[in-house]
């Protein structure tokens, strides 16, 4: 058998364009939906299609991350509108409508456009071929879960007879382990949630027939995902592109030449980069969004990229012991004028939005942070805003005064 051909990065194509760091930043902002008029007609589903993946997380401060992502781009979007856009429930007694999205492992646990189902065939195959899992399953548990879903229709883990014993993943029941494994294999899918609980169904019943296949080989899956990641990023290094859907660098290397992305150089990056050719056709212009960002937003979820593009060091501290936190439990980066200008660690107390800690790079950012807090307060039905701490007492007083003038 002939040895497989492996492409490496030792020989790189000539760059088709040279971008300044500022041009790359604006291309990235536009690609992520933060430059120009919001696509309100496309709405939440348009945001999902544009980004290709929206990360899920259980933390809920102002809102959950999958709600914060469309809010950051569109403004005040009703939570029911968000949930219905992602998870359209099937009417009782009728055939399920075509789902708009499904949940799967991408950058992390994510909501993905249903059209991307075929692209993850490579990952489903890898999971099926995996020899070891963290949990051993009792004999017959997996088959029983599939049999029950086939007979009874879409069910939560509780409906199946076994959710988590505790909140920790390592203490899942056998049924929960089985249904989650079936989801990773692609035999089961989640296209709906009820009260934040996943609703599981057979993929053959929930995924549209035209998409329900694993026909794409691994190379084609990777090529498409690299192309989509490049489009969603606008411009990125190999590591940026790989991180978007958690691919390996060698997987990106193997397909990037055939992905449709074009090689570019970006001043100051010091690494080869690739761009979406459509992103290079027009100069990024338009109005910038001023908003709070979820730490799980795809604009900032890659720490190395965020630091390179924005000069902003970002780290989620929710899992850091409280005495060691620098910026707060759920510090949200503040985007204003196309730059990250500070952080706000928010919470809610009744109808009061509390900025537990505000960290700003400059007093000049106070008006933008005040605007972001006022919009967020309106969105979550808070009528007052309180600033507990800032990185200097003067900043706290100035921000409080600015907010009081607008409330």
What are these regions (language model features)?
Residues 2-407:
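Long, charged, low-complexity, helical-prone intrinsically disordered regions
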């Amino acid at each position: 058998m002939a040895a497989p051909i492996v492409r490496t990065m030792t020989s790189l194509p000539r760059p088709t364009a040279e971008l300044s760091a500022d041009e790359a930043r604006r291309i990235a902002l536009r690609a992520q939906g933060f430059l120009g008029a919001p696509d309100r007609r496309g709405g939440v589903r348009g945001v999902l299609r544009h980004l290709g993946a929206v990360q899920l997380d259980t933390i809920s401060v102002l809102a959950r991350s999958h709600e914060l992502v469309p809010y950051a781009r569109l403004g005040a979007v009703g939570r029911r509108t968000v949930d219905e856009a992602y998870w359209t429930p099937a009417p009782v007694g009728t055939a399920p409508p075509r789902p708009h999205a499904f949940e799967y492992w991408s950058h992390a646990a994510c909501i993905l456009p249903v059209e991307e189902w075929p692209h993850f065939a490579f990952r489903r195959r890898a999971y099926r071929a995996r020899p070891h899992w963290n949990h051993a399953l009792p004999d017959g548990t997996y088959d029983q879960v599939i049999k029950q879903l086939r007979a009874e229709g879409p069910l939560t883990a509780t409906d199946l007879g076994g959710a988590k014993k505790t909140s920790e993943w390592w203490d899942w029941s056998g049924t929960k382990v089985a249904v989650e494994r079936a989801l990773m294999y692609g035999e089961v899918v989640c296209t709906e949630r009820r009260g934040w609980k996943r609703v599981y169904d057979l993929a053959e019943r929930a995924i549209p027939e035209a998409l329900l296949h694993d026909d794409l080989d691994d190379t084609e899956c990777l090529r498409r995902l690299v192309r989509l990641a490049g489009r969603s990023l606008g411009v990125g290094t190999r590591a940026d592109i790989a991180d978007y859907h958690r691919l390996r660098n060698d997987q990106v290397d193997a397909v990037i030449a055939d992905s449709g992305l074009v090689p570019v150089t970006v001043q100051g990056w010091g690494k080869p980069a690739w761009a979406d050719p459509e992103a290079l056709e027009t100069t990024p212009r338009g109005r910038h969004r001023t908003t709070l960002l979820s730490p799980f937003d795809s604009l900032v979820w890659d720490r190395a990229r965020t630091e390179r593009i924005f000069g902003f060091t970002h780290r989620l501290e929710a899992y850091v012991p409280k005495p060691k936190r620098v910026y707060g439990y759920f510090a949200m980066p503040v985007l204003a004028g196309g730059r990250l200008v500070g952080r706000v660690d928010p919470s809610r107390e009744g109808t009061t939005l509390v900025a537990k800690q505000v960290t700003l790079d400059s007093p000049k950012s106070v008006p933008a942070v005040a605007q972001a807090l006022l919009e967020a307060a309106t969105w979550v039905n808070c009528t007052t805003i309180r600033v507990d701490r800032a990185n200097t007492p003067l900043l706290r007083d100035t921000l409080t005064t600015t907010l009081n003038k607008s409330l």
